[in-house]
Amino acid sequence: MGGFFSSIFSSLFGTREMRILILGLDGAGKTTILYRLQVGEVVTTIPTIGFNVETVTYKNLKFQVWDLGGQTSIRPYWRCYYSNTDAVIYVVDSCDRDRIGISKSELVAMLEEEELRKAILVVFANKQDMEQAMTPSEMANALGLPALKDRKWQIFKTSATKGTGLDEAMEWLVETLKSRQ
């Protein structure tokens, strides 16, 4: 009975945790972003084998954030986590010109999945503090983002280590999620 009332309360007042996946190739900065969002500072990370899951509160909204490993051997398992996802933060290393094609292939395959049909897409053009970084518009074109017609998406210039661009990206995500409900 208590569960019934708490679910009514949650639906009326929007206290449900939003489910967000942080995806991208290995070394893009996914785990650094997760912990920067959660604790507000850079923490030492190691390559993610499997996943990290944390609750992040941003602007009074609670997010259950899943950071999935990006190694070639782990990417096929991403689909196991797609169900009930509200948004995908897709992190791309702006300096990794050699693998932008692989990043695009993974993004396209992911967006074709039925379980992610309604998920909002936020692309973090990460490592923008580096001199050789591609611009967000170069990256958007390389990833084929302008061709996405039936998907709410945005790309942001970010640096996980410096913390730049994360607030703007999260602000957009929060507003987009709120307007969708």
UniProtKB/Swiss-Prot annotation:
Gene3D superfamilies the UniProt entry points to: P-loop containing nucleotide triphosphate hydrolases
GO biological process: Golgi organization; Golgi vesicle transport; intracellular protein transport; protein localization to Golgi apparatus; retrograde transport, endosome to Golgi; toxin metabolic process; vesicle-mediated transport
SMART domains membership: ARF (SM00177), RAB (SM00175), SAR (SM00178)
Primary location recorded for the protein, binned into one broad class: Golgi
Taxonomic superkingdom: Eukaryota
Keywords carried by this UniProt record: Golgi apparatus, GTP-binding, Lipoprotein, Magnesium, Membrane, Metal-binding, Myristate, Nucleotide-binding
SUPFAM superfamilies hit by this protein: P-loop containing nucleoside triphosphate hydrolases
N-myristoyl glycine: lipidated positions: G2
Record Pfam families: Arf (PF00025)
Membrane topology: Peripheral membrane protein; Lipid-anchor
Record: residues binding Mg(2+): T31, I46, T48
Binding site for GTP: 24-31, 45-48, 70, 126-129, 160-161
Compartments, record wording: Golgi apparatus membrane; Golgi apparatus, trans-Golgi network membrane; Membrane
A single GO cellular-component term on record: cytosol
A GO MF term: phospholipase D activator activity
Oligomeric form and interacting partners: The GTP-bound form interacts with GOLGA1. The GTP-bound form interacts with GOLGA4 and RGPD8. The GTP-bound form directly interacts with ARFIP2. Binds to SCOC, preferentially in its GTP-bound form. May interact with UNC119. Interacts with ARFIP1; this interaction directs ARFIP1 to the trans-Golgi membranes. Interacts with ARFGEF1 (via N-terminus).
Function recorded in the entry: GTP-binding protein. Can activate phospholipase D with very low efficiency. Important for normal function of the Golgi apparatus.
Protein family (similarity comment): Belongs to the small GTPase superfamily. Arf family.
Name assigned to this protein: ADP-ribosylation factor-like protein 1
Gene for this chain: Arl1
